[in-house]
Each structure stands twice: as structure tokens, then as C-alpha cells.
Amino acid sequence: MAENGVWKEKGHCRQEHLTGQKKIANLYPRSFVRRGKSMEMRFLVESSLSDLAALQSLVVSTLPEVEIFMPHDEEYLSRIFQTEHSVLGVLAGEKLVAYSIIRYPGTGKDNLGQDLNLAEEDLKNLAHLQAIAVHPHFRGYGLQRELAAAHLQVLESSGYEHICCTVSPKNPVSLNNLLSCGFRVRALIPKFAGWWRYILYKGVSRSSDRPKKAESEDEIGIACSNIDGQRELIRKGYEGYSVGKTGENFDLFYRKME
């Protein structure tokens, strides 16, 4: 799961971005099979609000720790639906089993690019991968990666150049899924209710977002639970790019960008 942000009325995507999104609409609905189960990915509209809210509640109720995922109320979700192609869902039969939300924060204070000190012009071309959630019975099907990749394609088609999202350090599985989609950890700061969050960034228009290893620096692995150590690495110009497991502990591997 990934989540971030507080709703802002201003900063909806520009008309040319909406025009770009329409180019991808004919790709959905899209049918596929996972582990012998037939599924369909499609854009959701506001009539799916109650199903989405119910799935969100179920997901939150099964979390080992409440701070892993910040849920959104129905008023917030209703406003999200007002922007076309902002919500993708995966259905198994008629049952919603996963969803992804994107949002366009404009240059407001809740734009995650502010946490990365991006220029104002870049903030205007930045979108949030706001949230991804998967039904507990459908975890391990690769749906989080599938949804992230699909919504990234929507944003690329719409002309957005910068994408950000947040992930809890206590959620290494979601972190690994997003890193595999080209995101990189650029910050680690307290966000909602003081909960620690990685700020992940991806440049959509780049051919590759993989950090290049500087000749004088080696890869450094550090426990996801080591907040201070990771913040110090980030301060020194390192980016997190890969998750590994040592025994029962998850490590995030950092490399310094050239």
C-alpha cells in the first residue's frame, strides 16, 4: 500500500493533461488471469465509491500496525472521483479486490515535491500516486505493481514529468513493489500524524531512474527500522533503490547519485 497527502481543491491537472489521459482510455477495461483467477482492470467512477471505501476499511482492519496506511474518508474519495481516470480498480468477477488512486496537488503545501525542494515549475508537472490497496486474500498476485505501472502509464501519457508517493518504513513489501517500478527513496520524514514516511520519486520522462554508482562509494544496506541512519545517508546524497531481507529484518539499499 502507498498513501499520501491532504486534498487540495486547487491544482487539478491542466486541460492538456486531461486530453492526454483520454488517449489511454481505450486500453481499459483489460482482462487478465492470475493464479487461475480471471480479473479485469478498469477505471472506476463514483458509483464504485462504496465498494472502494469498504475495501479500504477491510485493508486497514488487517494491518499489523495502524500507522502503515492512512485511510481517506468518503468525502475525500468522492472529490478524487471528479478527476477523470484518477481511480483504477481490479475486479475478480464483480468483486473489487484492489485499487489505485492518483492525484494532482498543484503547487500547494501538500505537494510532496515541496519535501524534495523541487522548483515551482516542476511542482506544476508533478502528480501523486496517492494510494494503492489490495484485498488481503489477493496479496501476492502482483496487483500492486500492476496498478502502479498502469497508472504511471496514464501519467506519462498525460504529460506529467514527476511522480511522488509515500510509504511507511514498516511496509517493506509495498516499498519493494514501488522501487521495482522505478521509484527511488529521496527523503524520510514524519508526515501524517507524525508517522514516518519515505518520500519516493520517479521521473516519468527519464529512460532510467536507476542510481548510478559513484566510483568512490559502495552500496550501503541499512535496516528499514534505522530511521536516523537512513536520514543521514539521504542527507549525504544517497537514494534508496532496493529492498533486501536479512533474517527477519528488511534492509533498504542505498547508492549515491553521481
Roles of regions detected by a PLM:
Residues 119, 129-139, 168:
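A short, internal acetyl-CoA/4′-phosphopantetheine-binding micro-motif in the GNAT/acyltransferase core
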Residues 27-35, 186-258:
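Intrinsically disordered, low-complexity, positively biased terminal segments
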Residues 165-175, 222-225:
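Conserved beta-strand-loop-alpha-helix junction that forms the acyl-donor binding cleft
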Residues 169-187:
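Conserved active-site alpha-helix within GNAT-family acetyltransferase domains
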Residues 26-28, 32-75, 81-91, 96, ...:
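Short amphipathic alpha-helix that is part of the acyltransferase structural core
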